[in-house]
Structures are given as C-alpha cells and as structure tokens.
Regions:
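Nucleotide and nucleotide-moiety/phosphate-recognizing core
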Residues: 1-102, 107-129
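Glycine-rich phosphate/pyrophosphate-binding loop and the adjoining helix
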Residues: 122-144
C-alpha cells in the first residue's frame, strides 16, 4: 500500500492508496496509518524518497522480525525509522504518542520490543550509503 497525505496522486499506480488517518503527523502518522491498513503480521515501512532499496536486505531483515515489534536499522547512532518493520503491537503505543503530542517516531519505542539491526550486519548484505540515501531533488538523483 501507499500511504500519503495526497493519496489521490498515486491512485493510478494500481496499488492500494490510503490517506493519513491523522493529518499533519509526518512519518509517525504515516506508520500509524500503514499499521491500521496492514495485514495481521504488520508491515515494512519505507520512505518514498529512498530509490535504492535492496531486496536481499529487506528479505534478510524479514527473517529477523520474530519476537520484536520494531525491527529497525541502526547506523551511526541513528535509527532508520523509514526502512523498518513494525508489528500490529505498535498501533496502540503510536496512538498514545500521538495523543501526547509526540511526533518523533522513536517516541513509542519504550513501550514495545525493539530490535536494532546493526550496520556491520547490514554491510554484509548491502551498501548502507546507497540503500539509505534520501533523494529529495532530481539533481540529487543525477549524482547516482
């Protein structure tokens, strides 16, 4: 599925498109909406501006999800929250974060089981410098 505040823009792609349930909450609101519409096992969330995804990395990460509510890459002291798996167990904690006015994706992590995927493990499968790059302008894309 595609989650976007302007979901009509993507309706021609042949994929289910859903508007944010909670408007104006950025990535946390998008994850909340994705989980609301997800299958019972949860979902993999990725940002729309990450064009160099690695299928092998995503599949390998999927194999690590058992026992965790959030499976998330952790590189250079930062979480890659928009390249992560989220279980249905995150839905209510995210809802509480939104009610408290918390906008940071990590705001609910203390309430759920989080498993970090360390950079050394990722580097065995994919190049983090490429996989986690964000392209915000066409000029950025031309560099690759």
């Amino acid at each position: 599925s595609i989650i976007a505040d302007d979901h009509g823009r993507f309706s021609g792609l042949g994929l289910p498109c859903h508007a944010d349930i909670v408007k104006g909450w950025g990535p946390l609101g998008g994850i909340y909406t994705a989980l609301h519409h997800a299958r019972p096992g949860g979902c993999f969330v990725v940002a729309c501006d990450m064009p160099f995804l690695s299928g092998p990395l995503i599949r390998a990460m999927a194999g690590l999800t058992a026992g965790s509510d959030v499976l998330i890459p952790y590189l250079n002291g930062n979480y890659e929250a928009l390249h992560a798996f989220y279980s249905p167990g995150c839905l209510e904690p995210i809802g509480r974060s939104i009610q408290r006015g918390e906008r940071r994706v990590v705001s609910f992590f203390e309430e759920v089981a989080v498993r970090r995927v360390e950079s050394a493990w990722i580097k065995e499968i994919a190049d983090p410098a490429r996989v986690f790059i964000n392209i915000n302008y066409l000029d950025d894309l031309e560099k690759f």
